[in-house]
Amino acid sequence: ILYRSNKLGNEIHTRSEVSNKAVVEICGIVNHEGYDFLLVGSEKSMSNTPDDIAASHYRASFYNRYFKRFKAPESWFYPGALLKDKTKMFIEQSNCPVGVFVNRNFVKASNVIVVIDSEEDLFLLGYAQTLLKSTHGSASVLDKSSSTTPGNEVIKEGILRFTEDVKQTTLLREKDLTPQSFNGFNFMLISYKTWNDVSEHRKEALQKMPSTLILSK
């Protein structure tokens, strides 16, 4: 981050603190010091970088060797459930939008897929437009909504306006996330609410996902 910021000429101030209540402390800083966006990293098990994969494999091996024989729930040892709770705490306790970054060998965000599942997700199009201004890349919208989705007409109008007003943007024909949905994309924008849904019901597809930014309003 510091390297990229220096290349872009952006100034970043680093800050280090030790706390056993990290979420509370971070949210306190965000709220009391007037920040307008909070960006946090996801757990290592969601990453596909070599070091993080190795760490996840070691953790799995350690659990299977020492804990499984005692029938201890994996949730005691694996941070998946804890991460969900922690992310929820960041979102609920912060007075600003929150982004959770999932690193999947991130290099650049030049080909972006934006997942829209409800009227509430339309705010992602604003993030996509801002992103394209800096990357000069392209964005494609995957509209998961159906004719029975509340606000369906508003969703269609919002996406149509986005694809007409912003260069290098398209609406994908497909309506659902599959492993093939991510072919050709190196970045995904998705809302926290929709992420919770697809992470439960489209686990196979997410194995192929690119680097991702999970956003809350």
Where are these regions (language model features)?
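Intrinsically disordered or low-complexity boundary/linker segments at protein termini
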Residues: 9, 24, 36, 40-217
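Charged docking surfaces used in two-component/phosphorelay signaling
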Residues: 16-24
